[in-house]
């Protein structure tokens, strides 16, 4: 247990930052899940919209050092590949 006033304050600050970081990380994760749901449903417009939001939120998490940049890059890359594959699949069906 902290004895110094500054240490007690830091415990409070850390709890607040942890909650904020958890919310931001959860928001990014939820957008990734929404993208996957749109992919499963085959809704291209929703996929593009959620991809942009997921990418933006992942980059924000990287800038605030909530997640590692390579983790965000990997998730964004995989979503982009799935979006492109879906696009190619739709074009093949149209032909």
UniProtKB/Swiss-Prot annotation:
An example of a GO molecular function for this protein is: structural constituent of ribosome
Q: Does the keyword Chloroplast apply?
A: no
List each coiled-coil range.
Answer: none
GO annotation, biological process:
translation
GO annotations of cellular component type? small ribosomal subunit
Per UniProt, the keywords (alphabetical) are:
Ribonucleoprotein, Ribosomal protein, RNA-binding, rRNA-binding
Q: List the disulfide bonds.
A: none
Q: Which InterPro entries match?
A: Ribosomal_bS20, Ribosomal_bS20_sf
**Transit peptide listed as a keyword:** no
Question: HAMAP family this protein is in?
Answer: Ribosomal_bS20
Concerning its family, UniProt says:
Belongs to the bacterial ribosomal protein bS20 family.
Which PANTHER family does the UniProt entry name for this protein? Answer: 30S RIBOSOMAL PROTEIN S20, SMALL RIBOSOMAL SUBUNIT PROTEIN BS20C
What is the role of the protein in this entry? Binds directly to 16S ribosomal RNA.
Q: What is this protein called?
A: Small ribosomal subunit protein bS20
Q: What is the lineage of its organism?
A: Bacteria, Pseudomonadati, Pseudomonadota, Alphaproteobacteria, Rickettsiales
């Amino acid at each position: 247990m902290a004895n110094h006033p500054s240490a007690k304050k830091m415990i409070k600050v850390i709890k607040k930052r942890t909650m904020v970081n958890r919310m931001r990380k959860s928001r990014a994760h939820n957008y990734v899940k929404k993208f996957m749901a749109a992919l499963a449903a085959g809704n291209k417009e929703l996929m593009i919209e959620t991809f942009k939001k997921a990418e933006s939120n992942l980059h924000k998490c990287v800038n605030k050092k909530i997640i590692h940049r390579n983790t965000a890059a990997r998730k964004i890359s995989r979503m982009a590949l799935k979006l492109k594959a879906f696009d190619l699949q739709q074009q093949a069906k149209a032909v």
